[in-house]
């Protein structure tokens, strides 16, 4: 029974590493220990956060007054939602929870950055 549990844990760890390694910058794989994977996901999230900030600033410049106010409100609420949503994963059990939470932050931040990058195409 112990061998089965150890084998299952190893498979889950490898699957998580493979999943994390497929995300974001193709040149950067999030392989290694849990700590290394979490640090890698944090670095990728920081890259996407920078892109999101730049896109947000550009969208604010491009928007009219009413749109700017609404975008500011939406962005603040989106950040609260992202943080609360990813905290759900972080509160899970085991070390996989830290990886799941890191991937949640990375993927949601990437999606929002891409959405804001396309925002200028929808205004006017």
Model-derived features with residue positions:
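Bacterial N-terminal signal peptides that target proteins for export
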Residues: 1-8
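N-terminal signal peptide c-region/cleavage motif recognized by signal peptidases
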Residues: 14-18
């Amino acid at each position: 029974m112990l061998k089965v549990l150890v084998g299952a844990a190893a498979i889950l760890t490898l699957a998580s590493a493979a999943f994390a390694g497929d995300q974001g910058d193709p040149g950067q794989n999030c392989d290694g220990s849990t700590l290394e994977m979490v640090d890698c996901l944090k670095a990728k999230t920081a890259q996407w956060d920078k892109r999101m900030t730049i896109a947000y600033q550009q969208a604010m410049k491009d928007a009219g007054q009413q749109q700017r106010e609404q975008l500011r409100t939406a962005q603040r609420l989106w950040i609260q939602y992202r943080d609360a949503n990813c905290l759900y994963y972080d509160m899970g059990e085991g070390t996989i929870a830290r990886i799941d939470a890191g991937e949640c932050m990375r993927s949601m931040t990437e999606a929002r950055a891409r959405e804001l990058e396309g925002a200028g195409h929808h205004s006017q």
